[in-house]
Design a protein with these regions (language model features):
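Catalytic beta/alpha-barrel core
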Residues: 70-71, 118-128
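Glycine-rich, proline-tolerant flexible connector loops at the mouths of alpha/beta enzymes
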Residues: 45-72
Length: 134
């Protein structure tokens, strides 16, 4: 199996830009993601907007609020990723909050992320205490 994330770090350093999906719109987000890859991104972090982005600074907090005010939903982000994945080959990783995943449904979120072509997820507010040993 091909591991795009592992390949992104094959040469040690990687350029990893971030964008909040839906700010200013999902259509613009798609174009920005494509340009990020064209300009050398090795991996791209896609922020799923959340109403209480406590781990973010004021700029990304404001981007989350603008995206949500514009009607962005997790389902719409998945649909956008499906479209962009047809042309973007670098790894795509969601950066969002645990509540987004939990309220959506863990299994449903994972299935939709895989179907859309996502390579991973970062949940900065999920404590390791919540992780059980296999």
């Amino acid at each position: 199996m091909n591991n795009r994330i592992k390949e992104a770090f094959a040469h040690g350093k990687a350029f990893i830009p971030f964008i909040t999906c839906g700010d200013p719109s999902l259509e613009v987000t798609e174009q920005i993601i494509i340009e990020m890859e064209k300009t050398g991104a090795n991996l791209i972090e896609l922020g799923i907007p959340f109403s209480d982005p406590t781990a973010e600074g004021p700029v990304i907090q404001a981007a989350n609020i603008r995206a949500l005010s514009g009607g962005v939903t997790t389902d719409k982000v998945f649909e956008m990723v499906k479209r962009v994945r047809k042309v973007v080959k670098v790894p795509l990783v969601f950066m969002t909050y645990a509540n987004v995943v939990f309220s959506y449904g863990i299994e449903r979120f994972a299935a939709n992320a895989a179907e859309a072509g996502m390579d991973g997820i970062i949940l900065p507010d999920l404590s390791l205490i919540h992780i059980s040993e296999p």
